Amino acid sequence: MAEVSFGIELLPDDKPTKIAHLIKVAEDNGFEYAWICDHYNNYSYMGVLTLAAVITSKIKLGPGITNPYTRHPLITASNIATLDWISGGRAIIGMGPGDKATFDKMGLPFPCKIPIWNPEAEDEVGPATAIREVKEVIYQYLEGGPVEYEGKYVKTGTADVNARSIQGSDIPFYMGAQGPIMLKTAGEIADGVLVNASNPKDFEVAVPKIEEGAKEAGRSLDEIDVAAYTCFSIDKDEDKAIEATKIVVAFIVMGSPDVVLERHGIDTEKAEQIAEAIGKGDFGTAIGLVDEDMIEAFSIAGDPDTVVDKIEELLKAGVTQVVVGSPIGPDKEKAIELVGQEVIPHFKE
């Protein structure tokens, strides 16, 4: 059986103490990674992860995911160094291009091609280059500085560094990637790739692109942790698990390009109807339009036996980490415990 680790993704939209508690529950149930979303409208990932670091001892902790635009890379580096120190060397970094819904509210274009951290630049810069440069700045910082960088997207002065992390430049860097350029770049520069997908068909497309980038950088695919950032829902009652996932699946359908919908045989007209309903705030109609094909394509949902079967198919497609993402289950804490009791042990035998 292929080796696999388990992570959990949590949206910090509830009390920080509650989210930190769920991370502790995840650690107690065999999860190895905790990823916290980074959006302006929720609690700070840094605050939540700091709380979690104090009450946990093994689970790795990091933003899942942040972006190169809404926070200066030196500030991100300081946050990560601080988290690594507080957690005793358990920090990880997840970084991607951001998301349209958040950027619209912040007045940023998506995809963002503005060289925000280099005011002298005149040319547009794509997300892959932005992430590559921001990573280089962050790791200069984590090596102890001083940081001095001039690229297409980022330009700094000579920045001295007082903060010291425990892992230094060995802190793992994960890149959120979907399209071919981002996947290939992740294969070149990242320790892991966070792919927003729950179905083997998507990894049959993604993994070769990751491997292509790895080979060009003189690396092996075996060096890269391929993480399925899933829409996940588990309950002993399979119908309840599926029902809980429908609103999340509706949003995934709305945001999926036609090429992805066609890959899974999804009716594009129905997808447009879902997008229209969500746009009007009519979530009941959107949920009602979610069908079995959409659930199958965009989620891992069901009872423990069903979930195990679906994860086994992901492993065959090259996945090495399964991230249990929203909604997790009808009851988050019970779902985390159920994964720990009846899913993770199956893959650790």
From Swiss-Prot:
InterPro entries noted in UniProt: F420-G6PD/mer, Luciferase-like_dom, Luciferase-like_sf, MeH4methanopterin_reductase
Which pathway does the protein contribute to? One-carbon metabolism; methanogenesis from CO(2); methyl-coenzyme M from 5,10-methylene-5,6,7,8-tetrahydromethanopterin: step 1/2
Alphabetical GO biological process terms: methanogenesis, from carbon dioxide; one-carbon metabolic process
Indicate the principal place this protein occupies in or around the cell: cytoplasm
Cellular localization per UniProt: Cytoplasm
Q: Which GO terms describe its cellular component?
A: cytoplasm
Q: What class of enzyme is it?
A: oxidoreductase
E.C. number: 1.5.98.2
- Per the record, what are the reactions this protein catalyses? 5-methyl-5,6,7,8-tetrahydromethanopterin + oxidized coenzyme F420-(gamma-L-Glu)(n) + H(+) = 5,10-methylenetetrahydromethanopterin + reduced coenzyme F420-(gamma-L-Glu)(n)
Q: How is its activity regulated?
A: Requires the presence of relatively high concentrations of either sulfate or phosphate for maximal activity.
Sorted keywords for this record are:
Cytoplasm, Methanogenesis, One-carbon metabolism, Oxidoreductase
Citing just one GO molecular function, the answer is: oxidoreductase activity, acting on paired donors, with incorporation or reduction of molecular oxygen
**What family is it from?**
Belongs to the mer family.
Q: What does this protein do?
A: Catalyzes the reversible reduction of methylene-H(4)MPT to methyl-H(4)MPT.
Subunit composition and interactions: Homotetramer composed of two loosely associated dimers.
In its UniProt entry, what is this protein called?
5,10-methylenetetrahydromethanopterin reductase
Taxonomic lineage from the root: Archaea, Methanobacteriati, Methanobacteriota, Methanomada group, Methanopyri
Name the gene behind this protein.
mer
